[in-house]
Amino acid sequence: MRKRSRMLLMLLMLCCMVFGTMHASAADELLGTVVDGSLLTDGTEVSYTVTPKARGTYLASGTGNLGLTAYRKLNMSGSTSCYQAVDKVKVTLYLQRLVNGSWVNVTTLGPKTDYNDYYVYTSNTYSVAGGYYYRVYGGHGAIEGSVSEAQTSYSDGFWVS
């Protein structure tokens, strides 16, 4: 009985070592590559700031942030800024993970809309599965009367064990 318990324990340890190495290898294999515009990093936080290519009348900038706050917990936040108060200012964020070479949506935060304001911010924390690269993709918009301005962007990605 004792010999059998030791054998099972050794087998379990061997499995943990093999599968743990496989996850690290998957991360290492892609580290430093660019997938759909996002650099895959070994950090624990990524962000972006986007400004319209042509200066708009209302939309000034948008930001998106994604950070590892605890074991498999990601905080996603973002904002949209306008040059002046507008009828509607909004931000929508998408938490994405890399699956078989493509970014797929995990969850959506927003749209968060403020009225008669120049700034909007939103934030939330999510539990995620390990073994993937994650990034934040965001949409930012301003509406004043019949004028609508919008911009999208995305961050780099980082590995969650």
What are these regions, as identified by a protein language model?
Residues 132-147:
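Enriched for extracellular/lumenal, surface-exposed ectodomains of secreted and cell-surface proteins
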Residues 1-67:
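N-terminal prepro-regions of secreted/extracellular proteins
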Residues 56-95:
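Short, surface-exposed binding/anchoring microloops in extracellular/periplasmic proteins
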Residues 118-128:
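Exposed aromatic-hydrophobic patches
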Residues 68-72, 98-101, 127-134, 161:
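A short, structured loop/turn motif at beta-sheet edges
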Residues 93, 102-117:
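Solvent-exposed serine/threonine-rich low-complexity stretches and specific carbohydrate-binding patches
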Residues 145-161:
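Short beta-strand elements
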Residues 99-102, 144-146:
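Solvent-exposed strand-loop boundary residues in beta-sheet-rich modules
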